[in-house]
Amino acid sequence: CKCPSCNFNDVTENCKCCIFRQP
């Protein structure tokens, strides 16, 4: 995952991985 803070409210392409718990 490339989302620094892994904000679950952030649904941008870079942060979607955080929401789905991917790298």
UniProtKB/Swiss-Prot annotation:
Q: Sites of the modification Proline amide?
A: P23
**Does the keyword Disulfide bond feature in the UniProt annotation?**
yes
Q: Post-translation: what modifications? A: The name as25b given in PubMed:23474143 corresponds to the hydroxylated peptide. The amidation of the C-terminus of this hydroxylated peptide is not directly confirmed.
Q: Which residues carry this modification: 4-hydroxyproline?
A: P4, P23
Which keywords accompany this UniProt record? Amidation, Disulfide bond, Hydroxylation, Neurotoxin, Secreted, Toxin
Q: Which GO terms describe its cellular component?
A: extracellular region
The record's subcellular location field reads:
Secreted
Primary site of residence: secreted
Q: In which tissues is it expressed?
A: Expressed by the venom duct.
The molecular function terms of the Gene Ontology recorded here are: toxin activity
Q: Write out the domain note.
A: The cysteine framework is XXV (C-C-C-C-CC).
What does this protein do, in the record's words? Upon intracranial injection in mice, as25a (the toxin without the two 4-hydroxyprolines) provokes paralysis of the hind limbs and death with a dose of 240 pmol.
Name of the featured protein? Conotoxin as25a
Q: Which organism is it from?
A: Conus cancellatus (Cancellate cone)
